Swiss-Prot record:
TM segment ranges: 95-115, 148-168, 178-198, 201-221, 245-265, 308-328, 357-377, 387-407, 453-473, 489-509
Sequence segments annotated as region (Disordered): 1-72
Cytoplasmic domain ranges by topology: 1-94, 169-177, 222-244, 329-356, 408-452, 510-551
Source organism: Cryptococcus neoformans var. neoformans serotype D (strain JEC21 / ATCC MYA-565) (Filobasidiella neoformans)
Topological domain ranges for the Extracellular compartment: 116-147, 199-200, 266-307, 378-386, 474-488
A Pfam family annotated for this UniProt entry: Choline_transpo
Superkingdom of source: Eukaryota
Compartments (UniProt record): Cell membrane
GO BP term (any one): transmembrane transport
Entry protein name: Protein PNS1
GO cellular component terms, semicolon-separated: membrane; plasma membrane
Biological role stated in the UniProt entry: Probably involved in transport through the plasma membrane.
Length: 551
């Protein structure tokens, strides 16, 4: 089920491929293969009613001479995309992965319930929990009002700093992109020099390679800043008009945190419940192998569930506000982004497309599990003094880590295809492969520039929150920190709060930039018809946009 069908009940908006007539007095159309060369309009250029600093764009530009773009073979198969490809059947995709995912989550919940129930019954081995008839032998830690105030102030400061950084990024996009790119290169060189000074040779060699690569690519990436700047400005403007995207990502963050806490307690409870000799092991069915197997299963289910949650959020953003803006334009009394776009996209992502999301997430989960298993083997070999075996396993870990990164990057665009066009995972992966073959370098550089700018904003936010935590402890002198023993944990926790808040806000921006990039590759003429002024600005900094992705 496509975004258009889902939002409009199957009514098409008329985004069929058009042959733009040449402007009056312009050269005749080239009939060779139906192609025409770009010819600027004659006379006074049309007024698109759009300022360059506001790429959010109006959906109703004044009529006038239309720019003529080169019609390649044809615009990313526009007829196909506005036909059957944009209207897949309304059905649940990838049913088998969906069933496996549901079974894994239900099994995890059952194991967790049994384990935590046994854990609570024996007071958590002195952890202060359980039936009062048995006795609460554990000690508890109570947060006083100083800690509560600190957490509230740090959270508020983190949100304010994240908002201010986005405002600065919107106002000074090009400057911040250039500065953060240069800072990344300088940081890599600095870490490399530091490791050489302290004679940490393995780390020094790794960062020497990273520094050389970053210096080599620096100049090439600078040339692509104009496109990243325009897409970033457009995305920030979209989110300014639709702040619900931030609500979506923060809800996702809260759910992820809750699932992580659930997994942590489950693993602890599994050890308590089934470890031989434990007070909770009363039925004689305990063994170390059972503990290992259940922890492995819990870890697998947790990683898969965590991946699915994050990818459902991505599909909600891509198929909701950002996809709705690209295909329908800004919200107006007569149309634009559909109402409750995020809610509708979430419903589709968590029902019809959940199997496709689970399919892609399973691939990443398997790779992450392999990496964790290799980590355990490497620690074992190092403990046995087998350095050669440890080095070989470390190399294997690096290889699997690289493969995992590539699969995750590939999957991000596949999920956007799923969110926009309602595909199952395999067709989405095929179209993503075509997209990345044709625009892979452009997408990678664009994501790197945007990601670097957002990353430095997160570090700045985390640092300022940590400074606030330090000064708060210094001037309030809470009783629990009379000897300064909790200063480091509180400062670190403050840093992590600010860091995560910025990364959460940044994930919405990253999703928007990638969604618009996919739209420009798959259906460039949609934006050309809806907002020719914005499309012309993009064409000036990225001429390939008029070609579309061949299929």
């Amino acid at each position: 089920m496509s975004a258009q069908e889902f939002y409009q009940g199957g009514n098409q908006r008329g985004y069929q491929q058009q042959q733009f007539p040449p402007p009056p007095g312009g050269p005749p159309q080239d009939q060779n293969g139906g192609k025409q060369e770009y010819v600027p309009p004659q006379g006074q250029p049309p007024n698109y009613n759009m300022k360059p600093s506001q790429p959010y764009a109006s959906t109703n530009p004044e009529t006038g001479g239309q720019p003529v773009y080169q019609d390649t073979a044809p615009f990313s198969q526009a007829n196909e995309k506005t036909g059957e490809r944009m209207n897949p059947r309304k059905r649940v995709n990838d049913i088998i992965p969906l069933i496996l995912f549901i079974a894994a989550v239900v099994g995890f919940a059952v194991v967790s319930g049994i384990a935590i129930h046994g854990f609570v019954q024996v007071n958590g081995l002195g952890g202060g929990m359980g039936d009062s008839s048995i006795g609460r032998t554990g000690s508890s830690i109570t947060l006083d009002y100083h800690t509560v105030y600190l957490l509230l102030v740090v959270v508020a400061l983190g949100l304010v700093i994240a908002s201010l950084y986005l405002a600065a990024l919107r106002a000074f996009t090009k400057i911040i992109l250039e500065v953060t790119l240069a800072l990344t290169v300088i940081l890599n060189i600095g870490i490399c020099i530091y490791y050489f000074i302290i004679q940490y040779w393995s780390g020094a060699i790794i960062f020497l390679i990273i520094a050389l690569v970053s210096v080599f690519f620096y100049w090439g990436m600078r040339k692509r800043i104009p496109l990243a700047k325009l897409l970033l400005q457009t995305t920030i403007d979209v989110t300014k008009h639709h702040p619900s995207v931030y609500v979506v990502v923060f809800i996702g963050l809260i759910i992820q945190a809750a699932v992580s806490v659930w997994y942590t307690f489950t693993c602890i409870a599994i050890y308590v419940k089934w470890t031989p000799g434990s007070a909770a092991c009363s039925d004689g069915g305990c063994s170390s192998s059972k503990v290992a197997g259940l922890v492995f299963y819990a870890t697998f289910s947790y990683l898969w569930l965590s991946q699915v949650i994050g990818n459902v959020i991505l599909c909600t953003l891509a198929g909701g506000v950002f996809g709705g803006w690209y295909y329908y334009g800004p919200r107006t009394p007569g149309g634009g982004v559909p109402k409750r776009a995020s809610l509708l996209a979430f419903v589709r992502a968590s029902t019809l497309s959940l199997g496709s999301i689970a399919f892609g997430s399973l691939l990443v989960t398997i790779l992450e599990l392999l990496r964790l298993i290799l980590q355990l083997f490497r620690q074992y070999e190092a403990g046995q003094g087998d350095m050669i075996g440890s080095i070989l396993i470390c190399i294997a870990q690096c290889c699997i880590g690289c493969i995992q990164w590539m699969v995750e990057y590939f999957n991000k665009y596949a999920y956007i295809e799923i969110a926009l066009y309602g595909k199952s995972y395999i067709p989405a992966a095929k179209d993503t492969w075509r997209l990345l073959k044709d625009r892979g370098i452009d997408a990678l550089v664009n994501d790197s520039l945007v990601g670097t700018a957002l990353m430095w904003g997160a570090y700045i936010n985390g640092f300022l929150c940590a400074v606030l935590g330090y000064f708060y402890l210094r001037f309030t002198h809470p009783a629990y920190n009379s000897d300064g023993q909790y200063s480091a944990p509180v400062i670190l926790f403050s840093f992590l709060i600010g860091l995560n808040e910025s990364f959460t806000v940044g994930s919405a921006i990253d999703a928007g930039v990638s969604t618009i990039f996919v739209g420009l590759g798959e259906d460039p003429m949609v934006l050309a018809e809806r907002s020719p002024g914005l499309f012309e600005m993009i064409r000036q900094v990225y001429p390939r946009v008029v070609q579309g992705v061949p299929h």
